[in-house]
Amino acid sequence: MVRFCSATLGLLLLAAAAQAQDDKLDTKMALSGERLFRTYCGACHGKAAKGDGPLAKDLKVAPADLTRLSEKNNGAFPFQMVTETIDHGRNVRGHGSQDMPAWGDAFKSTSQTPDEPKRMMRELAHYLWSLQPK
């Protein structure tokens, strides 16, 4: 029982530490996220993340302007919603018969470590956070 409680407490502390890291913008993560954004997101969302990428015109629904996420969330950056959308995709019908890609699956299939996909999604979210008007 003591081992179980110790293990559970350890996991809770790790989760709390990871959550605390996302309470404020991390510029180092944002810089890494910019590279990922250009690789995975820019074709649809555009270089400036305004939804005007070169593939946007081919979609039924225009990609979101990702520079307005905080504005649409009462001034707070919706970090968890962003990482969940990156991970699981989004039910948007702009991709014809497909929804927005679930990048979490793509990241998992190419990752060297189990933690890498989550880190990549967090880096992307920090980058998008850095694009929000102050």
Language-model-detected regions and their locations in the chain:
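Positively charged n-region of N-terminal signal peptides that target proteins for export
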Residues: 1-4
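Bacterial N-terminal signal peptides
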Residues: 6-16
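Electrostatic cytochrome c docking/interface patches
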Residues: 18-36, 72-74
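Sequence context surrounding c-type heme c attachment/ligation sites in exported
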Residues: 31-39, 114-115, 133-134
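The canonical Cys-X-X-Cys-His
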Residues: 33, 37-47, 100, 124, ...
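Detector for the c-type heme attachment site
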Residues: 44-51, 105, 129, 133
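Short beta-strand/turn micro-motifs at beta-sheet edges
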Residues: 52-56
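Extracytoplasmic electron-transfer domains, predominantly the class I c-type cytochrome c fold
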Residues: 58-124, 128
